[in-house]
């Protein structure tokens, strides 16, 4: 399996073009008792952590039906690392540090990063917060039979960042919420999330009707059980979906023809443009999602929006075309080729 194979298997959630949820994940950080955090560890300590992790992964692969495949990060190209960062598998700025290994299953839905910000980062991707939590918890317990975790009776699981101490569980979701933005309801939604220990933040440079993408994640990990965090996440996603549906109904009714015009113009640009930058592609993907939401056209393969969001990534364009040295114009040219192919494959 190549990095590109992994990227294409771990797209945004398929079949949800009419919904606000685009991607979801649960991340569980763990550190090993008796070893310094990766950021302050020497090569010998990092190698020892890698060896312990490999032992646990080896037993997993022998006993479980969902094997994990290794990707030593230092052996990857800079563009491959950038693509894995875009996909959420790697933290930013990890570079070519020694003994950093990413283990991933064949579907790209389960991964274990060794020697990242913490010794282990167990990550599961999907749409159901409870299932995601149970998945990372199962892996955590399985690995815990081979690995002594760093745990404090007062502070819980110890992490490199004090903001993750306690459960060390981070629930995340990326959403498309033009209804909340256009109706002015996003601020109230953010306040509601904050009351439950979560935050709503921008994904890209701005949050507006052109780029209506937001990220939801928990800010509290100490003093709250994992089950409670997962349940709160599920409830917030449900509340946001209801609020988005109501908000979008108001926005669409008040600007129906203007919004439909924007959708058709976006489709035309995707179908015929010869240069497309990432920002324009993100904006067009949002409009196409809204067109599908309003049944203006079908999404036969249930993955058109996710393909367009992938194409917005410069690393994805370079990896797909095998042209890592593309300049800005070359990247825009090849992105336009990719999105035209997406539109053609979708039957437009």
What does each of the following model-derived ranges do?
Residues 1-154, 169, 181-183, 187-348:
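Long, Pro/Ser/Thr-rich low-complexity/intrinsically disordered regulatory tracts in eukaryotic proteins
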Residues 156-175:
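Conserved phosphate/anionic-ligand binding catalytic regions in large, soluble enzymes, centered on
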